[in-house]
Amino acid sequence: MVHKIIFSHLFVFISFLSFSSVNNESRFSIITIGPYEDELYSAFGHSGIRYYNKSTGEDVFYNYGIFDFDQPNFYLNFLNGKLLYKVGKYSYPSAERFYRNQDRYIKEQILNLNPPDQILLYNYLEQNIKPENANYLYNYVYDNCATKIRDILEEVIGDKLSYAKYDEVISFRKLMDKYLDNNMWGDLGIDICLGPEIDSNIPYESKMFLPDYLFESLQSAKIGDTVDLVSETNEYIPSQNKSYKNIFSPNLIFFLLFIVVLFISFRQIKYDISFHKFDFLIFLLTGSVGLLLSYLWLFTDHLSTSNFNLFWAFPLNLIFSFLLITNFSRRLLNFYFILYS
């Protein structure tokens, strides 16, 4: 046991010697990148870690938000909630150029870390980017690019790290809604597919799944009682913030659908005729959505359990949609319609 303790201290000491020559010229920063409306996966922003060493010129970006469309079974893994993300390291100037070209704001928080904590953070990140350690199982709110950074800082700094507490009471869904004003179809997909788990009020630390909330939390964080975690903040704000809304919004489409249903219902009542093809489409659509929700609930790791949307998107509608256009028993169909309504 004594030998292990001596070895551990010796390892830290050697690491310190190897790092001390550049320690005064190096720094770690948390980088927060603004939302990008063109893609749903970028709509909430992004977080990463920058390491800059002035004496050697090394300037790199540790990115926990990398995924590969070419990975085996990508779409099946995505559907099952088992998508692998990974951490990678590449040039920070290249990363900054990329995000600037997308007209996204960039905020840098330089961390006020002492030499031993810098060594721990550096070694942690370098171990993480090794191929055998780089992959992790992504989760929308529990394990993403922002929560990874929160967890790493807490592991490196330990109990000395504390956050200022805010009284805002809010759920995951309401936090997401703040970012989806211009991505209404994405908002609709989240509202339909994710269940009531994301409607519960969450503790303050859980809000850091969003990069902006991580930024806000780190701004007021302390090491011990008096030392600010962030020593300096730099910001790049784009000259113009592109913002647009898709005119073909869910509200417009559902309003038009309501007008069509109203028109068809009026003609059915007035002329005593049936529109089985239209009923077929409605039941086919709601049944297909219900089948997807049932699959997400029963067979995946998504936040989709106990989804009350199954009350209107009923999977059996899929079967009865085809019975509508056959000579199947009208009595049974009418009974199902009454039961469904």
Regions found by a protein language model. Give the residues of each.
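Bacterial N-terminal signal peptides that target proteins for export
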Residues: 1-9
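N-terminal signal peptide c-region/cleavage motif recognized by signal peptidases
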Residues: 15-17
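Activation targets extended, charge/polar-rich intrinsically disordered C-terminal tails
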Residues: 127-317, 328-341
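Extracellular structured ligand-interaction cores
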Residues: 27, 46, 59, 108-110, ...
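Membrane-proximal intrinsically disordered regions of secretory-pathway and membrane-system proteins
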Residues: 21-25, 233
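A cross-kingdom signal targeting lumenal/periplasmic-facing segments of multi-pass membrane
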Residues: 68-143, 147-157
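Glycine-rich catalytic cores of cysteine/serine-nucleophile enzymes that process amide/ester linkages
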Residues: 24-103
